[in-house]
Amino acid sequence: MDHATPRYLHAKESVDERARSRRVRDLLLDTLPEDPRVVDLGCGTAVTVSNLRRWGVERGRYRGIDAAAPIVAHARATRPTICRRAGATVAEDPAGWRVDDLDCRLRVGDALALAREQFPDGADLVVAQAFLDLVDVDDALAVV
């Protein structure tokens, strides 16, 4: 099975949601600044954008990185519409899109190599769901 297909990634969203701890999410949201810098390693379909909005994060900067160009193209084409259907105000531009006041940009490439470039002064949140099991953890921790 190819785990980098839009159909597979969308199908597993509900399973991923049920696997998340509400207590951990609430602790995260309590410590996240009002205008967070978020880096999503192995961003896939950029579902983190929808999750952030659903959790009340409507401002900040989101940067997603994925090695699979077709997945990033799919995310760019579909995530703004998904957010719009969920009631968000979405504005698209050539570089990405805004969901409410959350500026969203996606890049194709090696997530570990590009992670620090997104926010040279550091990110407030690094998301790496279903990613850290695919890379060397020590290499990942060295860049975050």
Set out the residue ranges of the language-model regions.
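Conserved class I S-adenosyl-L-methionine
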Residues: 35-44
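Class I SAM-dependent methyltransferase Rossmann-like catalytic core
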Residues: 1-31
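A conserved beta-strand element that flanks and buttresses the S-adenosyl-L-methionine
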Residues: 127
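Hydrophobic adenine-recognition pocket in adenosine-nucleotide-binding enzymes
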Residues: 131
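A short, conserved alpha-helix within the catalytic core of class I
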Residues: 134-144
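Class I SAM-dependent methyltransferase SAM/SAH-binding core
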Residues: 52-113
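Short conserved loop adjoining the S-adenosyl-L-methionine
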Residues: 113-120
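Glycine-rich SAM-binding Motif I of class I
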Residues: 46-50
